[in-house]
Each structure stands twice: as C-alpha cells, then as structure tokens.
A protein has these predicted regions:
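Iron-associated oxidoreductase/ferritin-like identity signal
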Residues: 1-182
Length: 182
C-alpha cells in the first residue's frame, strides 16, 4: 500500500515528503493538545468552569481521535512517527496549550481558542496542498478541519467573540472523523 499510495500522491503533484512532515507535525499537535487539554479541563472549576468542562472534555477526546485517524495515513504514505516522545513533542505544529499562570476560566478559554486556531491553520494548509490531488488525505484533513472549526467556535462563543452558530453535538465520535477510526 505504501508504494502505491505515495506514487499516486506524487503523480498528482503533491510533494509527499512535505505532506508527511505536515501530517506528523499535526499528529504531534493533536497528541500534545490531548495531554494539555487534560490539565486545562481539570482546572475548569467553579460554576463557570463546570459549565465548560464537558465541552473541553469532548474537544480533548476528539483531538485524541484526530491523532488516531492521522496515524494510518502517515504510514500509508511511507512515513512514521518519531520513536522519541520528547522529539515528537518538539515538532508539534502548534505551541503547547499550557495552563496559564492565572488559571481563571477566561484565561483557560483564551488558551483553548488559540490552540484551536492553530489547528485550523494547520489543516487548512494540508487541505490546500491536497485538494483535487490526494483525495484520501484531503478527505481526512477536511474532516478534522471541520471539527477544529467547531471546537474553536464553541470556545470563542464563551469569550463573546462570535455568534452562536454552532452547538455541541452529544455523539460519542465526531460525525466527520468517525469513518477514519473504523
């Protein structure tokens, strides 16, 4: 599969090495975000924090699912994950979503929004690179992009940055990404 997948992608005009670099960096971002969202979620306390805890938990689990969905495509294209977790962390496409010094709900929301904005930019770049050329990677990146936009919107709305055009779906798996996890 690796040889054919890479050959098809390259014949379509996609730089497979650059694509793999982006996929691995975004996989790193998803896994590290999952880790940091665990810490952020644990610090969403009080009446206001408890209101957001479930939303942060859903975004956290979906980010882990995004990581799981990216891994097969990375290997299909002949890539691999780094075998050193520290190095894998260091190549993340996004800065760490660390708990702010002042862990108020507002400050945690700002961290969550910035983390989601970064992933939106990352998957937009992958979509732009693969649109009309690498249908499988494009489909995967677009599915994740749709979820990241939704996550960003959830958190942005709590900061009063946008209209409430999104709502949280109570599904076990993302309707966009679940087909890649079967």
């Amino acid at each position: 599969m690796t040889k054919v997948a890479r050959e098809v992608v390259e014949k379509a005009g996609v730089n497979a090495d650059k694509l793999l670099e982006l996929l691995v960096k975004n996989a790193s971002a998803e896994l590290t975000t999952y880790y940091y969202y665990t810490i952020l979620r644990a610090n969403l306390i009080g009446l206001e924090g408890e209101t957001l805890k479930e939303i942060a938990e859903i975004a956290r689990i979906e980010d882990r699912n995004h990581f799981e969905a990216l891994v097969p495509r990375i290997y299909e294209l002949g890539g691999k994950l780094l075998d050193d977790m520290k190095k894998f962390y260091d190549i993340s496409a996004c800065p760490p979503a660390k708990l702010p010094e002042n862990p108020s709900v507002q400050e945690i929301l700002k961290v969550l929004v910035e983390a989601e904005r970064c992933t939106v930019r990352g998957y937009t770049q992958i979509c732009n690179m693969t649109a009309g050329k690498d249908h499988r990677t494009y489909d995967l990146a677009l599915a994740i992009l749709n979820k990241e936009i939704e996550h960003k919107s959830w958190f942005s709305e709590f900061l009063g940055e946008g209209s409430s055009g999104y709502f949280m779906r109570r599904e076990e798996l993302s309707q966009f990404v679940s087909k890649f996890l079967k």
